[in-house]
């Protein structure tokens, strides 16, 4: 008996003591993996800065983006007075790009949010119940996928009319099937797991299973796709505005600014360069951030 107690004590003494602050939660593991990705961290800082600028754009902008006109410096390039130069109407491009961040970012985020909400609901129901609802939902998605996204958005705006609100609706519509298929695939896998069978065996309702067990299992995929989809939505909204179907002059939206700059690109290329650069950097940042989130949330994909 003494020998047994001695051996047990020896084993206990050999076991490393785990301090409370050494216990790693899923959040700690995610942050540890994410902060190692320098490109993703840089993109995250850029996105945070962009959000702050978008929120306070009208206070940060040195001039009124719509009603300020410097007729003495028409089409002048960048200077100390006008950091990004002046357009053909004498408006300060730097101020318009800052305020344009507010409009373009809001359009992209709201469009993806609407598409994600509807698509997630459709995907959960289709993957969980299958049957006729699954077939109907996926056939609708197939029809929407048959059209290029921008053409579908143009068709929707042509029916609803021009304007930034209708652009958000149009971009949201062609985001729905992408989220629906993503969530449906995850749901089909998760519903076969033993913990779902256990939940059913104790009498959990379908709503409880969907919201408390299946939906949390799809959140990481939704977050990653949501982040990357924002870049696509910003490009789509800017493209519609460039074609004259979105934000209308003098609204300082990036796509609308490019549309107005077409006539002066030869004599004043800076008028188009800075709005285009804003679109490029924003889309790149969201894509890099999405890649980083994917690798941090599911390191097996990276491997």
Curated annotation (Swiss-Prot):
Q: Which UniProt keywords apply?
A: Cell inner membrane, Cell membrane, Membrane, Transmembrane, Transmembrane helix, Transport
> Under the GO molecular function aspect, what terms does this record hold?
dipeptide transmembrane transporter activity
Where are the membrane-spanning stretches? 40-60, 105-125, 144-164, 165-185, 222-242, 266-286
Pfam families named in the record = BPD_transp_1 (PF00528), OppC_N (PF12911)
Function comment: Part of the ABC transporter complex GsiABCD involved in glutathione import. Probably responsible for the translocation of the substrate across the membrane.
Identify its protein family: Belongs to the binding-protein-dependent transport system permease family.
Q: What is this protein called?
A: Glutathione transport system permease protein GsiD
Which species is listed as the source?
Escherichia coli O1:K1 / APEC
